């Protein structure tokens, strides 16, 4: 096919059960490695359970998950589910949470899994937001990679995180349930 991985969206499949979505993923993963995709409900996605993400993480040939639920609790469900998987070291996590880009990339998630401390970081972003200022995005990402393992991170990164989220509002139209997202990206 000429592709390395397929980003497999669960969007538009609200009539499918979680088990049907998992079976669909298993079938696609037989053909090509998969990146699971958690898309926020306001733009066609749906809420998926912790159990769904734990099972998805256990599917051979799933190698990454893009998390874009725009919801901290749902993002935590995915990270915790992957950490609970025996395949946790094989699965890369990417943020698609344009409303929390910098914090997602700076955070090291840590969970107690059966008495063991398990840590996981988001390794990158697949973000519509960054499509409008790629040079700055790349610079921020390089800067974040250089500092995120430090014991202390300058507080200015928290201010920068809010500035990026504020800019996100201009692109994605959250005031109108993200209905202007495509037009916003195209305009900017």
Task: Indicate where each model-derived feature is located.
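Active-site beta->alpha loop and helix N-cap motifs at the rims of alpha/beta catalytic domains
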Residues: 1-53
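Catalytic alpha/beta core domains of metabolic enzymes, predominantly
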Residues: 30, 35, 40-182
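Scaffold signal of the M16-like zinc-metallopeptidase fold and its non-catalytic homologs
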Residues: 182-188
